[in-house]
Amino acid sequence: MSSITLALSKGRIFEETLPLLAAAGIVPADNPETSRKLIIDTNRPDVRLVIVRATDTPTYVQYGAADLGIAGKDVLLEHGGAGLYQPLDLDIAKCRLCVATRKGFDYAAASRPGGRVRVATKYINSAKTHFAAKGVHVDLIKLYGSMELAPLVGLADAIVDLVSSGSTLRANNLEEVEEIMPISSRLIVNQASLKLKRELIQPLLEAFAGAVK
C-alpha cells in the first residue's frame, strides 16, 4: 500500500500544525514533546510523521525521505528551495525577520548606501540579500544561537534574527531597527512525490487549504 511521510519539527510548528492535521483526519499516535520516537504513526495507516530539526525539514523533503513537510519561510530562504513545491502558506508560527542593534547605535547612519555594518546571524542568505539591496557593505558573522549577545560584547554592530514579541531584545537592551520580512510556515512537497502519490497528497493539500481560510 502506498503511503506518505510528513516531516515536522518539535515545538511551535508541531503544536500549530495539529489543527491542520485534524482537518485532514490525521491524529498522531504520540506527542513528540513527551515521546522519544522520531517516527510517529497516525490513526491512518497510509500517513506517518517524522520528527526532524526545523532547519533539516527542507532537506528531508528535497531528497524524498519525506513526501511533505512544514517549514518556516526563514528556513526555506536559507535552503534555497531546490526540488520543492511550495503550494500553501499555512499562516502559522508567525513572526518577523528583523535587524536589531543595541540601544543608542546609529543604525541609520551605518546602513546608508556605501556604509558598512558588521552583522551576526544564522540567516546568512537573507541578510546578504537584504543589505545588498540597500547598497550597504556587510560583514556577516555566522552564529547558531544567543544572537543578542553579539552586539553587547562588540562582536557585531547588529543582528538579523527572528522576532516575535521582542521581549528578549528588550531584556538585553537591544531594539528592533528594521523589519526585513514577515515570516510564517509553509507546506512543502517533494516534486516527484506530488506526481507519483497525487491521489494521497492532493486531498491533504485541499484539507490544509480549507483549514487555513
Swiss-Prot record:
GO terms for cellular component: cytoplasm. Belongs to the ATP phosphoribosyltransferase family. Short subfamily. It comes from the Bacteria. It catalyses: 1-(5-phospho-beta-D-ribosyl)-ATP + diphosphate = 5-phospho-alpha-D-ribose 1-diphosphate + ATP. It is an enzyme of class 2 (transferase). Catalyzes the condensation of ATP and 5-phosphoribose 1-diphosphate to form N'-(5'-phosphoribosyl)-ATP (PR-ATP). Has a crucial role in the pathway because the rate of histidine biosynthesis seems to be controlled primarily by regulation of HisG enzymatic activity. Keywords: Amino-acid biosynthesis, ATP-binding, Cytoplasm, Glycosyltransferase, Histidine biosynthesis, Nucleotide-binding, Transferase. The keyword Cytoplasm applies. InterPro entries: ATP_PRibTrfase_cat (IPR013820), ATP_PRibTrfase_CS (IPR018198), ATP_PRibTrfase_HisG (IPR001348), ATP_PRibTrfase_HisG_short (IPR024893). This is ATP phosphoribosyltransferase. GO terms for molecular function: ATP binding; ATP phosphoribosyltransferase activity. Lacks the C-terminal regulatory region which is replaced by HisZ. PROSITE patterns: ATP_P_PHORIBOSYLTR. NCBIfam families: hisG (TIGR00070). Its EC number is 2.4.2.17. The gene is hisG. Heteromultimer composed of HisG and HisZ subunits. It is found in: Cytoplasm. Pathway: Amino-acid biosynthesis; L-histidine biosynthesis; L-histidine from 5-phospho-alpha-D-ribose 1-diphosphate: step 1/9.
